[in-house]
Amino acid sequence: MLLPQLKQAQKRGVPIRILTGNYLGITQPSALYLLRSELGDQIDLRFYADSHRSFHPKAYFFHADKESRVFIGSSNISRSALTSGIEWNYCLSSVVDKQAFDQFYASFEDLFYNKSVEITDTVLKKYAKSWVRPAVAKDLARYEKQSEEEKQSGLKQEYQPRGVQIEALYELEKSRKEGAEKGIVHAATGIGKTYLSAFDSLPYKRVLFVAHREEILRQAAEAFHNVRPDDSYGFFTGDKKNADVDLLFASVASLGKEEVLKRKFSPDSFEYIVMDECHHSTADQYQKILDFFHPAYLLGLTATPERMDGRSVYELYDFEVPYEITLKEAVNRGVLVPFHYYGIMDDTVDYSALHFVRGHYEESELTAAYLENTKRDQLILGYFRKYHPKHALGFCCSRQHASHMAKFFSESGVAAGAVYSREDNTENEGDEKAYWLDRIEAVKKLESGEIQVLFCVDMFNEGVDIPVVDLVMFLRPTESPIIFLQQLGRGLRKAPGKEYLTVLDFAGNYRQANLAPYLLSGETANFHASTADVALTLPYPQDCIVDFDLKLIDLFRKMEEGKRKGHDAVVHEYHRVKELLQHVPTRVELFTHMDEAVYQYCLKEAKENPFRHYVMFRSALGDLEKEKCAWIGTDAVDFMELIEQTSMQKSYKMPVLSAFCEADGGSVNGLKMAVTESDVLRSWKKFYQTGTNWKDVNKCKTKADFENMTDKDHLQNITKNPVNFLKQSGKGFFVDKKGYLIALKDEMQAVLQEGGMKFADEVKDIVQYRVLEYYWKRYRDKA
């Protein structure tokens, strides 16, 4: 409301200073982000910083040529306080009472310069991450909403970024100014990521939005059209191929084919591309799209937890995560409703008797265990009736399971339906088929109250908004943290009259059942380090209830006793990844798929870290190929372990080592014995021109600083740091050689010849892993 006037004052050269407090969390981070975004460095924005005294004044100072005024009173900077609320304010003029004015102004000056801290990007980000919406904010929001509704009555709706969207837009623009060409927004369901991408796309003419379901594309098209009403838009799905539009909404299935991409588009067809649910980006069809197009900016959107289900997607986006807000933070900030979670012991199924293959229980065995289980059906129905929801979702393991539950509930007097893909429905037989509903029809009936519960199979995990859902039931093992949080997120959106979401989790003795407390609290990194009792005292989001059956707590304790720790946990995780991939994993593959808690343990315990001696680790497990066993005790293993263990305060050594791995002239079975200045310079510049990697280079505070560096500057950096340190490391593997910048010692010639391409592949794998490890750590520390 005040922003237009502040911007006008700024244009006139008026200095603007604001001193605010973080007392009781009344100051909203998004408001501060908006000020910084719109007014930039021309506003001096500060926090009161005396923790021993409360800060509660409201005063507004205005200075003119001949007079200054201060308004003192009860109005803070909020719509209701400045318009419709009952507030008392007093205006004091320096002309009328100079002594009193000077006293107030001197007090402000003292507070501003002596008892405050500047709100830098770092300070603001830290405040936003820890901010919890105060209880009084609910009343304030009600007043604001009423005032806004009165103002907007009869007016056309305006679409403007709100709340955390403002924060995300600020961070996205900041990252682009730093040179980023890609980025992931990792945000819990409910913040409006699609609208966020629409706002962020405004500076770009042609936009591509990619998703895996047509329903998501329709919702996205509506959002973009609301934000960009003058732009043409169309779809690239099924029989719709409207490629020549400003805003194109395309399904992965229709777009992710090489022949289609080459026939219909060029690599620069779009300036801005959005990949919805970007955790799918590693799939083949997504990869084809990413490989083909070269936009000015690529934005990935996801609500999933990055630390538990693989990291490869982050590599595709240069480990750039400009903005993230976890589910816990979103609930704390009032973006999502709180949840009342009930962990219910389901001992009607013995999961230990079922086969667990490649990270999942066999679907057919799960289905069989559920279909003829009257005791379980009654247990689920009993708890459902206890909490009497109006709009519920039940997540099932298969189409047969979903149909069975819909039939059982319907016959028990609860209007129910089943939702799964049409392909599955064609195979369904018997009268249970009668309970199947088309996805769109099902949502309408659930929203209207015509049916009370929908039982679904992988249909509502992501990308579908049904805000009215007030109860979700987990009716199958949720082995994947991604799936667990996606299912939870289906019911956390705010809706009129909805105060919280009820969650019924029917848990049994299945693998990782004891992960639930960590996922609900956001403390997943502590999974392998904590005890069962600690897990039950974790800090959950504000106003949330988490209640586990006593029998379930006993189960968690038993699982804790059997939980693998230390070396056993690392070995078990290695075998899990090997089973998942169906081959011995490379270092990069193990890093990509390793459980984050196990990985953190490896980083803390160097002796247990397989990445520091991966050949010997595999040898100890009997997983090393016969020809590679001959490397043990030779320079081959010593050289690899040197690269695996070399310290990396910065990333300087990696582009130098990458120069040895480049497949051009002079290599011996894929590796060079020596590299020239031009070899290293080419590798170095390519590496640091990627994304925001330039930040590592000495004396570079901005992307422009890096771009202005000469080859001489780069070579000075290269020679002084990585080349010098490599020559001093290990058993003298790196040496001087006439005509080259750096070389391998002569004895390595035999190693390269005898080791062949397999040795070269191991070395390249190490270098790639060390790069990924470095940037993952940088992202994690920043987060």
Q: What does each model-identified segment do?
A:
Residues 481-483, 490-524:
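Conserved segment of the helicase C-terminal RecA-like domain
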